[in-house]
A protein has these predicted regions:
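C-terminal effector/interaction modules appended to NTPase cores
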Residues: 91-297
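Active-site glycine-centered loops adjacent to acidic/histidine catalytic or metal-binding residues
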Residues: 1, 39, 115
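A generic structural signal for short coil/turn motifs at secondary-structure boundaries
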Residues: 5-10, 45-47, 93, 138, ...
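Canonical P-loop GTPase G-domain recognition
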Residues: 6-79
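Short, solvent-exposed loop/turn segments at secondary-structure junctions
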Residues: 3-7, 234-236
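Residues that form ligand- and interface-recognition hot spots within folded domains
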Residues: 88
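Polyanion-binding loop/helix "lid" in catalytic or ligand-binding cores
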Residues: 84
């Protein structure tokens, strides 16, 4: 923006900026769709393309490029995962003629469908989806990214913060080494984990150090999380990984977390909802860090 203020050297300035951005994006692993010189003051390349050749650029306007970008598909191809946000207890609504509870939330992964077998985390109880409610009341299916109400075929212990996870058919289920979740016929397609490798953007004035304990919010569930190790700090200007034993405010780094209870986490690249957490200071209740899961163990 503001390249009109450069005057006759706008093309040269834009060339330098474009080269620097392309280099940075390559090092950071960011795919660049377009780099557009604009002038908000004069409207160049914002809604309509500027005069051909302005700043040495002859491509489309910013608005045209944004409108042509593909919409990021919802995570419908992933196994069903549903964080429970609210429990409507023993509804007398006509939508649930048997008076069962409705579990409301937004589908994180997959598709909510009638007949889907699920396992409740953390209780481990299993059930089958009997009804799916949505904005059209009884749509039958609700895809990831949309809000839904789920009614199960039997009464199980489900509260706000719990997760409903798709079950793997017995023939596909693999026996895990985790005693708490090794029941093959009811194994979930997303094995819960207590240990996470993650990238954190640290926002608290109190530095992040190994051994500190925080509240971690995953979906709508709160669990205690201990910082097992600070692996490295990311140098913002060079993207180099620097050795570090702590992270100060506004730092980004790689850490390892040990959770008090298992959660259904997966890498952020695969699922935005299941791959993100928020760390909160247990004493001050300040939001301390934003976490992107890289791997679970």
């Amino acid at each position: 923006n503001k390249l009109d203020a450069v005057g006759d050297d706008a093309a040269t300035a834009f060339g330098h900026i474009r080269s620097a951005l392309e280099k940075f994006a390559k090092e950071a692993g960011i795919e660049v769709t377009a780099i557009v010189p604009i002038s908000a003051l004069k409207g160049h390349n914002v809604v309509e393309a500027a005069e051909r050749g302005w700043c040495g650029y002859s491509g489309a306007s910013l608005l045209d490029i944004l409108e042509a970008l593909p919409v990021t598909p919802a995570d419908t191809a992933l196994p069903f995962a549903f964080p429970v946000q609210w429990v409507e207890k023993f509804s007398s609504s006509a939508d649930t003629s048997q008076g069962r509870r409705i579990f409301w939330g937004r589908v994180a992964n997959g598709v909510a469908t009638v007949g889907q077998q699920v396992k409740v985390l953390p209780s481990g109880q299993t059930a089958t989806v009997a009804q799916v409610l949505g904005t059209t009341r009884k749509p039958g299916t609700v895809q990831a990214g949309h809000s839904a109400g789920v009614v199960l075929d039997r009464e199980v212990d489900v509260s706000r913060g719990d997760w409903l996870l798709a079950l793997v058919p017995p023939a596909q289920a693999a026996i895990t080494s985790d005693d708490d979740f090794s029941d093959t016929p009811t194994a979930t397609s997303l094995p819960p984990s207590r240990e996470l490798s993650a990238t954190v953007a640290w926002m608290d004035d109190e530095p992040l150090v190994a051994g500190r304990v925080y509240w971690a919010l995953h979906g709508h569930r709160w669990v205690k999380a201990r910082v097992k190790r600070v692996v490295h700090r990311l140098a913002i200007n060079t993207l180099a990984e620097e050795a570090a034993d702590s992270l100060s405010a506004n730092s980004i780094g790689h850490i390892e977390l040990l959770l008090q209870e298992p959660i259904a986490a997966m890498p952020f690249e695969a699922s935005r909802v299941l791959g993100s957490l928020v760390l909160v200071d247990t004493a001050t209740h300040r939001t301390a860090g934003a976490v992107l899961v890289r791997a679970n163990h």
